[in-house]
């Protein structure tokens, strides 16, 4: 996850304009956006982290740090203003400290135990400045100086403020104010001669002198290619130059003295593992000192390790199952020289000075070798002093068969004494992978001393506190002065005590003052003169002199309207059209608008279902083609994304108005349950009260299908039956209070007695009720008078327009869907609800098919089979009814 930190120059000199008409700061903002677009082409850019630092005073210089998201980064970038000084040194130190904030907590640097190239946090700092003189509060500086004192704990462990995986690049804007007459030549971008260039080269980066917009785009494309995971190493030659490969004679044409390839400051690429996305390694680069167990602290290290290479040709050594690390070198004069030798079968050993206990140069820990195809040079990192270790391990497994002898152990122990103790951990893992887990004893100490461990742990805790403090301070604005402090010019007596001043007063008033004025400035400590608040608009109607002359007529009109419309609770200081005059830059700021919107009120009665909007096609509920306000999408947009097809969209629909008829609170009637076939039937099973069910509707519901009042809620049986005496009043009260609106209908009619069926299966009662809800009773008035009390007949007419077929069916569908989703195989309630479906036969069949489709979604095979049998029975009985009616 590379970190891309942009350090933007926000000094006042960035307000200068180029020949394009834009300021340097606007050019810098556009360059950042262009870089992000170019970087987004790479799939690896998904893990990029962007940070933004300016030239302001810390901690206000950090605009976007570790916790800020991409939107915050872009918003802070757009709001940058060019004001202040060119404090490049302080800003660079702030940027490096921000990057190093968590390194001591995570242990990336691994102080005192070797440098792990595979444990890194690559970062690139891109500075965009105008290359002007460095200015501070103390004056103008010619050279770049970074502050030595850093508030970050643990900064004393590294000599430089940066680390080996952090590089600095600078875009120095040299755009002229006038158009150049000469045509631009397509050449390389030169280095800039400003003070930041040496700092870039020290970190492994470079500077770009940008003279035209075309050159700026070229630099940005080059910077995108520089985003690589790797660490910077100083390669230095040790010993004599290599002899020519051809005949072993020295090359006379080769110039003497220092060559560019003798000392290179370049990057080695640390490629991430394609499977895990994280680099994998085994061996560290040794420290430049021998660890001392008695030392209470660690000596400071350099940011970039100095790796010396010997030009003596050696054979590359590798044995089976022994891991090694391979890193590709960035193209440099050193890689070019090695590739020109065209000897991929030989290698040059690499060392770190003072890494051994008794040797100044140390022992080799790897080698440089050209690839077989001669297209790159690789650094192979091996175990420390590998020319001694590899033959020992080869003999152990090939000769001794993993059973070491006494002589071999003595040789191995003597090797361990020449190896830094922090190599014991990686070596133990390596020999375990090779098949010798007990070769190195666990009792051997290879860690740091207790005092050093305590010291590092203390630094880690302090770094964590500092990290939390810095992260918490990001985004805070500079505290503005609320007023101008009043300071006394002198600490002497006031002007009132001067003799000439007193005489002057006496000459004017011809009277001696009774008391001298005590105008001592000490009485005004903390006194401030208030500043004018630019955001506060003056109330111009209070003072006529505050009104500009050109706005007098407008104010008179506004004051007249406020006077005539005195019923308002407040006066309007501006016209209605001015309230909606918003700058274009703020029109899309929906988040700030939503913060000011009051929270919506809660539902008056959340248990009542909302009325379904059925205008037009009732089955098409999602209006995807509607034009809605984008501000509302932030609130209600994502809520309907995962709606299932066929499920009613209940969100965003106005709530159904409750019917205020007295019948809702009237006397409850015990429903009469009769058998389909004849005779006294068993009572309908009472259902338990369920808190999630919709509240019961009144027993006497009246629908408005025709001009005549058709009472669908009281369904009469035309077979002469009596009320079953087995149903107790308590049971019926329980059923009435807990059942659904449709479950209150317990008296289906039967027109099928003439068919002569003695047994119609389990769901015969439901089939009869399902068929006959759309049949009209023989005598509407008789049906109503038989079942509804006289006191309720007049009141029942008021309910005629309260409920419709669609509303009843919608509530039934919601309850049936809940029953389908419940676990188990108790489907009696589903068939009980199905018999109360309203509407024509075609509407009921469509309703039943939707129920079957929903049951198939939840793999309810038994329910599907019963519903299909139920559907076949309906078709069969409907055909018989049609046959009887035709006869």
Curated annotation (Swiss-Prot):
Keywords: Chromosome, Nucleus, Phosphoprotein. GO terms for biological process: protein localization to chromatin; regulation of transcription elongation by RNA polymerase II; RNA polymerase II transcription initiation surveillance; snRNA 3'-end processing; snRNA processing. InterPro entries: INT_SG_DDX_CT_C, Integrator_subunit6, VWF_A, vWFA_dom_sf. One of its GO terms (molecular function) is transmembrane signaling receptor activity. Residues 3-227 form the VWFA domain. The modification Phosphoserine is found at residue 804. One of its GO terms (cellular component) is actin cytoskeleton. Signal peptide: none annotated. It is found in: Nucleus; Chromosome. CDD domains: vWFA. It holds the Pfam family INT_SG_DDX_CT_C. Widely expressed. Expressed in heart, brain, placenta, lung, liver, skeletal muscle, kidney and pancreas. Induction: Frequently down-regulated in nonsmall cell lung carcinomas and prostate cancers. Down-regulation in prostate cancer is due to CpG hypermethylation of its promoter. However, some involvement in cancer is unclear. A motif (Inhibitory loop) lies at residues 626-633. Belongs to the Integrator subunit 6 family. Component of the integrator complex, a multiprotein complex that terminates RNA polymerase II (Pol II) transcription in the promoter-proximal region of genes. Component of the Integrator complex, composed of core subunits INTS1, INTS2, INTS3, INTS4, INTS5, INTS6, INTS7, INTS8, INTS9/RC74, INTS10, INTS11/CPSF3L, INTS12, INTS13, INTS14 and INTS15. The core complex associates with protein phosphatase 2A subunits PPP2CA and PPP2R1A, to form the Integrator-PP2A (INTAC) complex. The inhibitory loop acts as a regulator of protein phosphatase 2A (PP2A) activity: Asp-629 and Glu-630 residues mimic phosphoserine and phosphothreonine residues and bind to the PP2A catalytic subunit PPP2CA active site to block substrate-binding. This is Integrator complex subunit 6.
């Amino acid at each position: 996850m590379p970190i891309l930190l942009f350090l933007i120059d926000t000094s006042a000199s960035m307000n200068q304009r180029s020949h394009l008409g834009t300021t340097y700061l606007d050019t810098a903002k556009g360059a950042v956006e262009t870089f992000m677009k170019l970087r987004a082409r790479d799939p690896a850019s998904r893990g990029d982290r962007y940070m933004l630092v300016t030239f302001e005073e810390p901690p206000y210089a950090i605009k976007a740090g570790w916790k800020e998201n991409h939107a915050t980064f872009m918003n802070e970038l757009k709001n940058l203003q060019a004001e202040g000084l060119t404090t490049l040194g302080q800003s660079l130190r702030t940027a490096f400290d921000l990057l190093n904030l968590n390194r001591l907590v995570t242990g990336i640097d691994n102080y005192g135990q070797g440098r792990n190239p595979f444990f890194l946090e690559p970062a690139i700092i891109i500075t965009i400045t105008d290359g002007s003189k460095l200015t501070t509060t103390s004056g103008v500086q010619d050279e770049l100086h970074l502050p030595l004192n850093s508030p970050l704990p643990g900064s004393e462990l590294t000599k430089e403020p940066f680390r080996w995986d952090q590089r600095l690049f600078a875009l120095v804007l040299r755009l002229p104010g006038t158009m150049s007459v000469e045509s631009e030549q397509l050449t390389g971008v030169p280095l800039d001669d400003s003070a930041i260039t040496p700092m870039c080269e020290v970190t492994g980066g470079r500077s770009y002198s940008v003279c035209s917009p075309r050159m700026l785009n070229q630099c940005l494309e080059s910077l995108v290619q520089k985003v690589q995971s790797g660490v910077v190493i100083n390669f230095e030659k040790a010993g004599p130059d290599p002899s020519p490969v051809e005949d072993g004679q020295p090359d006379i044409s080769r110039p003497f003295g220092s060559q560019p390839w003798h000392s290179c400051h370049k990057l080695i690429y640390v490629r991430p593992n394609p499977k895990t996305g994280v680099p994998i390694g085994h061996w560290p680069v040794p420290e430049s000192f021998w660890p001392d167990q008695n030392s209470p602290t660690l000596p400071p290290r350099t940011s970039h390790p100095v790796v010396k290479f010997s030009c003596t040709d050696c054979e590359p050594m590798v044995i089976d199952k022994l891991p090694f690390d391979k890193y590709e070198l960035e193209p440099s004069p050193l890689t070019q020289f090695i590739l020109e030798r065209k000897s991929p079968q030989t290698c040059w050993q690499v060392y770190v000075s003072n890494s051994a206990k008794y040797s100044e140069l140390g022992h080799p820990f790897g080698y440089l070798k050209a690839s077989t195809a001669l297209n790159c040079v690789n650094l192979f990192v091996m175990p420390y002093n590998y020319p001694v270790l590899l033959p020992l391990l080869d003999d152990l497994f090939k000769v001794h068969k993993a059973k070491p002898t006494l002589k071999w152990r003595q040789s191995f122990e003597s090797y361990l004494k020449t190896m830094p103790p922090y190599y014991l951990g990686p070596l133990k893992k390596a020999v375990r992978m090779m098949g010798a887990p007990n070769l190195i004893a666990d009792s051997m100490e290879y860690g740091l001393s207790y005092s050093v461990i305590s010291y590092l742990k203390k630094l880690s805790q302090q770094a964590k506190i500092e990290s939390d403090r810095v992260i918490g301070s990001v985004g805070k604005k500079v505290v503005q002065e609320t007023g101008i402090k009043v300071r006394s010019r002198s600490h002497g007596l006031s002007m009132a005590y001067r003799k000439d001043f007193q005489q002057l007063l006496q000459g004017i008033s011809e009277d001696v003052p009774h008391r001298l004025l005590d105008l001592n400035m000490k009485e005004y400590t903390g006194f401030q003169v208030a500043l004018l608040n630019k955001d506060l608009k003056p109330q111009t109607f209070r003072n006529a002199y505050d009104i500009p002359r050109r706005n007098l007529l407008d104010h008179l009109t506004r004051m007249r309207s406020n006077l005539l419309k005195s019923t308002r609770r407040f006066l309007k200081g501006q016209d209605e059209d001015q309230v909606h005059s918003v700058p274009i830059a703020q029109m899309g700021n929906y988040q700030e608008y939503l913060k000011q919107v009051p929270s919506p009120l809660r539902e008056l009665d959340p248990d009542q279902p909302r009325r379904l909007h059925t205008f037009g096609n009732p089955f098409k509920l999602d209006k995807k083609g509607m034009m809605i306000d984008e501000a509302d999408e932030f609130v209600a947009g994502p809520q309907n994304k995962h709606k299932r097809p066929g499920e009613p969209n209940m969100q965003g629909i106005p709530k159904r108005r409750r019917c205020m008829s007295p019948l809702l609170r009237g006397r409850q009637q015990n429903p009469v349950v009769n058998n389909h076939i004849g005779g006294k039937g068993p009572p309908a099973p009472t259902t338990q009260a369920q808190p999630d069910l919709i509240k019961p509707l009144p027993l006497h519901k009246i629908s408005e299908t025709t001009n005549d009042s058709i009472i669908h809620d009281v369904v009469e049986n035309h077979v002469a039956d009596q009320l079953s005496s087995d149903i107790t009043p308590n049971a019926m009260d329980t059923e009435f209070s807990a059942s659904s609106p449709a479950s209150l209908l317990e008296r289906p009619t039967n027109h099928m007695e003439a068919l002569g069926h003695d047994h119609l299966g389990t769901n015969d009662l439901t089939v009869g009720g399902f068929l006959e809800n759309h049949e009209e009773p023989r005598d509407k008035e008789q049906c109503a008078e038989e079942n509804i009390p006289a006191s309720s007949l007049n009141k029942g007419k008021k309910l005629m327009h309260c409920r419709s077929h669609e509303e009843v069916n919608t509530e039934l569908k919601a309850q049936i869907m809940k029953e389908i989703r419940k676990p188990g195989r108790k489907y009696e309630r589903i068939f009980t609800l199905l018999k109360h479906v309203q509407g024509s036969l075609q509407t009921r069949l469509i309703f039943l098919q939707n129920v079957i489709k929903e049951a198939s979604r939840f793999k309810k095979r038994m329910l599907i089979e019963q519903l299909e049998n139920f559907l076949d029975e309906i078709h069969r009985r409907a055909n018989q009814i049609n046959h009887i009616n035709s006869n």
